[in-house]
Structure formats: C-alpha cells, structure tokens
Amino acid sequence: MSEALKAFEDELQSKNFKGYWQNVQGDTYREPVPSFGPCHWKGKDLFAAMEKAGDVVGLDVSFRRVIQLWNPSLKNGTSRTLVLNLQLLKPGEDALSHRHMAGAIRFILKGHGTRLIVEGESFETGAGDFVTTPSWTWHDHENRGEKMMWLDGLDAPLVRLLETDFHEPDPRRKQTVTKPEGYTLATAGALRPAWAKTNSIQPPAFCYKWADTERALSKVGEQPGDPYDGIVLDYANPINGGPTLPTMACQIHMLRAGEKTKSHRHTSSTIYHVWRGSGVSYVGDQRYEWEQGDSFVVPLWSFHRHENTAKDPAIFFVMNDKPLMDAIGHYREDAKA
C-alpha cells in the first residue's frame, strides 16, 4: 500500500467513511460463507446438566430454569437467527407470566401435567405435544403433575440483531384462564366463526397434540417422501397454512428403517433434535452419530445428509429460519451432484 493511499484511508476513517476497496472480500466471493459452524450436543450430557440444574437453580434465582444449546462459533444462540433451549419445571412450580418480542415454541420431551397458558388459554401438555407462543403474547407455565422437560425454540438471536427486543413482566404474575378448553381449535381450525377476525401476520397460540402427529406419520409413512429429508410434516399456521411462525418453521422428519437421504444445502439454517431413533448425519466435513435426545445444527449453505442405521424409524423435531429467507427472497437450495 502506498503512503498516499494509507493517508487517504486514514482521512476517510477520521470522517467515518470507508472505501469499497477496503472490504477484504470485495468481489471475490461467489456464495454464502456461514459465520458459524455445525455443532452436536449429546442428550445424555444435556439431561444430566438439567437434572443438576434442578437441584441447584431455583426459580427464585432464574426466571426460567433453562439451559441453552450454545454454538461455540457464536457469541449467543444455536444458529445466527435461532436458539434451542431445554427447560425444566418441577412438580408444584410456576414459571411466572411475561411476554417478549421473540416468538417461541415448546416441544414437550418428558412428563405430563404441565399447563402452558398463552394469552388466557390453557394447554394441557404431555410428551410429544407442540405449543406455539407467538411474538408478544403473555405466557406462563404451571406444573401440577410430573417433572417436565421441554425444548424452547426462539428467534431471539434475530430479534437481538434487529435490536427490537421488547420484554415485559406481567404485573399479574400469573394469568387467569379466560378462554374455554379447545378455544383456538374451535375458532382457528378448518371450521371457524364467520365473524372471527384473525391476525394476518402472527398466528394464534396453538397446541399440536402428539397423537395427531403420530397418526399423520402412520398415514403418510409409506409415501416416497422427500429425497433429502425423508417424510416431512409441517407444523402449519392453522389460519393460513403458512409456516409455524413468521420467522420460524417447525417440522417433524421421519427416516424409515435403513433410509439414507441425498445430500443438499440451502440458505436456511436448521436445528435438529432426535425425538426417536439413532443414526448418523454428515454436515460439511463433520460426521455426527446421534441417538434419542441428541441435537445438532446445520449452518446455512452447508451440504448435509442423514442415515437411519436402526431397524426402527428415526424421528427428528426440526426448526429452521426458511420463512425469513422466503420473506426477503433469499431462499435457495442446491443438491449435490
């Protein structure tokens, strides 16, 4: 670099300017290079840590007893836009009401008897049930049954990036249930009141029961499925059939016994949790052997494929940021030759 150019760049910097030629990448790049890598979390380690948290972390210390699946490539989060957590609520405990700009989902892993209350509607939950908590909805949890563990998925990293992270504790501390059981199913399902007004952006809070999911899997399990992901079920917005939340799509993937998928990549980042089964996944140059309870993340534009090495079906709970990529016209997919 010439002394004249160096002096000019210093002059630009002093006035809060920067030359395009100072961009290290410039015009040399041709495709996305993710800023974070893949990562694999072992379920046995996560659940052991959560059991210990249940002994030493009270709800007087932490508003929620939560352990984050932290990607060491990032300052925070599981991917650049999403975070997956594990939460524990012990019998007799109440997690107090609050609301936040981040949209959230809950996938129940263990136990029965916890009520997830969202916007005045109570959802009784058990293992395999899936509940949405859309952005800026009041929500609290009550456990009147067994010890419960569930996955929390949030778009909090995206909200922090956008710097729109509003958060509000509920002065009531706990919500009063104001809606009858099955209210949302009756007002936002295939049949709904003609006068009901719906939010065109945010879906209602909704509970997808595992019995219904399992029944659907049994009906479509003999279909060819997707060559890259196996059998895929979308947790669809009950109002318009769109993605689960505006920024997040959640799915169930099933790999039949011995099934091997083809390799592909896409501009959405994807988080997998092994709900059932065992197998192996290849993410870029990484090989992950997984079993029930494990989780792993596939960064955007990373080739990946899966193999079910067992004699029984393997089932993933999956969340991704494809709706965000679709909304801004950035979604692309590429199959490996």
Place the predicted regions along the sequence by residue.
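C-terminal functional regions that serve as terminal interaction/effector modules
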Residues: 1-42, 239-246, 250, 254-257, ...
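A short, N-terminal "cap"/entry segment at the start of jelly-roll beta-barrel domains
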Residues: 1-80, 169-170, 175-247, 332
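Conserved short histidine dyad/triad with adjacent acidic residue
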Residues: 65-74, 82-99, 232-239, 251-265
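Conserved hydrophobic/aromatic beta-strand scaffold that supports enzyme active sites
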Residues: 66, 84-88, 105, 122, ...
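A short beta-strand-loop-beta hairpin characteristic of the jelly-roll/cupin
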Residues: 90, 94-127, 137, 265, ...
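A short hydrophobic beta-strand segment most commonly corresponding to one strand
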Residues: 105-107, 132, 145-165, 272, ...
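Conserved metal-binding segment of the jelly-roll/cupin
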Residues: 118, 124-145, 150, 155, ...
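Contiguous mid-protein beta-loop-alpha structural module that forms a pocket-lining wall or clamp
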Residues: 131-188
